[in-house]
Amino acid sequence: MGGICIKILNMSTEGLTPEEIIEIRKILNQHIKNARKKARHKECLLCGKARGFCDSHTIPKFCLENIAWNGKLNSFNTLIDSKILNNDSGISNAGIFHIICKPCDGSVFQDYEKAEAYETYPTEKALNQIALKNALRDIYKHETEIEMFEASKQIMKEKNRILSLFVNPMFNAQIRAKKRDVQECYDIYNISKSFLTTSESWIRVVSYDKLDYTCPIAFQGMVPLVTGVDGEVINDNFNHKHDYKIEYLHIAIFPLKEATAVIMFIDSSSTRYAQFEKHIADMTQKQRLEIINRIIFLYTEDYYLSKHLDEDTIRILQEPAKLLQDPVTTDPKRSLRNAVKDYDLRRDICLPNLFSKEYSVKTDD
C-alpha cells in the first residue's frame, strides 16, 4: 500500500515496547480494514454480478510457489524491516485483491496464468490478460488508498483541528493524485476488457527474455517511468492537467520451473517510450535485465523475493526500498527535476542484479 503505509513503515519504532508495537499494529490493521470496506464494490467489476469476491492473485500462484520456501516469501516489508507489519508473506495472501468474483478469476485469465504460456513467446491474449489484471489490482489499491487518506483527514480533524488545517492540503493533494490514478487504471481496464474476445491487439512488446534458470523474484504490474535510459523525461507525474495522460510500462517477471520469463510491454499508441524502446532493443540481454532490475527496485513495492536469498543481498536491497516514497509537492517543475534525478537509471547505485544466474534458485519437481 503506497503513500500512507510507506510513511508508517518508515516510522521509527525505537523506544517502543513490544506491547506498544502490537497496539500500533492493531490500529493500522483496523485502519486498512475499514478503508477496504469503504472502497469495496457491490458487484464483480468484470461480470457485474453480486456474488462475492475471491482472493485474486496479481502474480500467478504457480510462480510464487516456484520461489517460496516452506510456503513463505519475502516482501517489500522485509526490506523496510518493519516492526509494524509482517516481514514475510504466505503464498495464499501474496499480492491478493478483492474486486472480482471466483468464476471470473478462474476463467478470464486462463491464458496467462499457466506455465505453458511461456514455453514459447506469450500470445496477445495472454499479454492482454496481464494488462487487465494489472488494471484491476491497481484500481483496488488506489481506491483503498483514497479511503485511507479520507479517514486520516477525519482522524486528524478530531485529534487536532488546528494541525489539520496545515496537513489537509497534503491529504487533498494525495487524494486528487490517487483519483487520477484510478481513472487512468479504468482506461486501461476498459481497453483490455474490450480485447478479451478478439485476436486483435493494442499492445506493443518492448522486450521478452526467457532465462534457463529460476530467478528469486516474482513481479507483475505497471510502472509510470519518469525517465528513460538517457535521462529523457517519459512521464511528468506532477503534471495534473486534465489532458495529460500517464503512459505505463507493464512488466511481468514470472519464475518458472528451471526458467524465468521477463516481459515488458506498452500500449501501442504510446509515444513517449520511443527512445527507451530503442535503447532496450540495442542492449545485450545482460544490460536489459540490469535496467529492469533497477526499475523494479526504484519504482515498485509489489515484488516477492525468495527466502533463499542471503542476508547480505537483502541488506543491500534495503537502501532503495527505504528511499521509495510517494511525494506531494506544490512545485511541479522542481519536483520533476528531482524525480528525474532520483529515478535516473544510469546513476551509481549498488544493486544486486537478481536476474544473474548466481542468484538463481532450485525449484521442486
Per-region residue spans from a language model:
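Non-transmembrane, interaction-prone segments in cytosolic or luminal domains
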Residues: 28-30, 55, 59, 66, ...
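Context-gated lysine
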Residues: 7, 26, 33, 37-38, ...
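Internal, well-ordered alpha/beta segment that forms a basic, Gly-enriched binding/recognition surface
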Residues: 73-176
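Charge-dense, low-complexity intrinsically disordered regions
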Residues: 175-365
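Low-complexity, intrinsically disordered regions enriched in charged/polar residues
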Residues: 2-3, 18, 126-130, 160, ...
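An N-terminal structural lobe/cap that precedes and organizes the functional/catalytic core
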Residues: 2-121
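Generic detector of well-ordered alpha-helical segments enriched in charged/polar residues
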Residues: 22-25, 29, 128, 132-137, ...
